């Protein structure tokens, strides 16, 4: 198994698919990385040489924010909004939808499981 950006990449998959196992790399980034390094996207990971794996690893480290750095940056951005006290920050703080979705019904994913209310029998 090749290890890139702290993630074990599956060896039996194509390179462009296997790179998507890294948090922060999607379809377009994986194709871009393959182009930049000069690796054919349809090749399998187990067919790559050690030099090619090192090139891919260096390309990802040099140009992309992935895995822990990306997660940390995202959480710091949310924390900054909460500290500012802006509308989006308040919505994050109250664990409600941030982007204008309705909350009267729905929003169960964001709000969590429904809390039973006493005296609501019919």
Curated annotation (Swiss-Prot):
PROSITE patterns: RIBOSOMAL_S13_1, RIBOSOMAL_S13_2. Residues 94-122 are annotated as: Disordered. InterPro entries: Rbsml_uS13_C, Ribosomal_uS13, Ribosomal_uS13-like_H2TH, Ribosomal_uS13_bac-type, Ribosomal_uS13_CS. GO terms for cellular component: cytosol; small ribosomal subunit. GO terms for biological process: translation. GO terms for molecular function: rRNA binding; structural constituent of ribosome; tRNA binding. Keywords: Ribonucleoprotein, Ribosomal protein, RNA-binding, rRNA-binding, tRNA-binding. NCBIfam families: uS13_bact. Located at the top of the head of the 30S subunit, it contacts several helices of the 16S rRNA. In the 70S ribosome it contacts the 23S rRNA (bridge B1a) and protein L5 of the 50S subunit (bridge B1b), connecting the 2 subunits; these bridges are implicated in subunit movement. Contacts the tRNAs in the A and P-sites. Part of the 30S ribosomal subunit. Forms a loose heterodimer with protein S19. Forms two bridges to the 50S subunit in the 70S ribosome. HAMAP family: Ribosomal_uS13 (MF_01315). Belongs to the universal ribosomal protein uS13 family. This is Small ribosomal subunit protein uS13.
């Amino acid at each position: 198994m090749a290890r890139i950006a702290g993630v074990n990449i599956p060896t039996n998959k194509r390179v462009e698919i296997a790179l998507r196992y890294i948090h922060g790399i999607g379809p377009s980034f994986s194709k871009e990385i393959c182009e930049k390094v000069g690796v054919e996207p349809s090749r399998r990971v187990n067919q790559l040489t050690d030099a090619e794996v090192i090139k891919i690893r260096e390309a990802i480290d040099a140009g992309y924010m992935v895995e822990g750095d990306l997660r940390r940056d995202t959480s710091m951005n949310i924390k900054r909004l909460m500290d500012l006290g802006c509308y989006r920050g308040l919505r994050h703080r109250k664990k409600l939808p941030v982007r204008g979705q309705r909350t009267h019904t729905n929003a169960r994913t964001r709000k969590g499981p429904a809390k039973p209310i006493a005296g609501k029998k019919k």
